[in-house]
């Protein structure tokens, strides 16, 4: 299954993205989701195929969600994931001497 998708970012929550079918745009996204998400800001369009790799999402799940519900919501990574990627010297800044 191939699908041209539009990706929107949330102005309220860093690293929160909404994937939708480009032809349908935001028409199938519930208002109850758009209120906390904020006014979606278009980032880019891309062709999704089962072979394509996404950085933080399973492309099969994204395609399935768009097919079934009209959108896929990518949540920001958890705080633990941010901490794992910090340089060691930053992690030690608050350590007692």
UniProtKB/Swiss-Prot annotation:
InterPro entries membership: YcgL-like_sf, YcgL_dom
Pfam families membership: YcgL
Family matches, as PROSITE patterns: YCGL
PANTHER family: PROTEIN YCGL
Name this polypeptide is given: YcgL domain-containing protein PA1295
Species assigned in the record: Pseudomonas aeruginosa (strain ATCC 15692 / DSM 22644 / CIP 104116 / JCM 14847 / LMG 12228 / 1C / PRS 101 / PAO1)
Domain YcgL stretches: 3-87
């Amino acid at each position: 299954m191939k699908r041209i998708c539009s990706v929107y970012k949330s102005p309220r929550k860093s690293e929160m993205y909404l994937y939708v079918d480009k032809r349908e745009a935001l028409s199938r996204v519930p208002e109850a989701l758009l209120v906390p998400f904020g006014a979606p800001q278009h980032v880019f369009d891309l062709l999704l195929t089962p072979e394509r790799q996404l950085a933080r999402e399973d492309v099969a799940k994204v395609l399935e969600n768009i097919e079934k519900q009209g959108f896929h919501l990518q949540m920001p990574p958890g705080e633990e994931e941010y901490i794992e990627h910090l340089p060691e010297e930053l992690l030690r800044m608050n350590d007692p001497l």
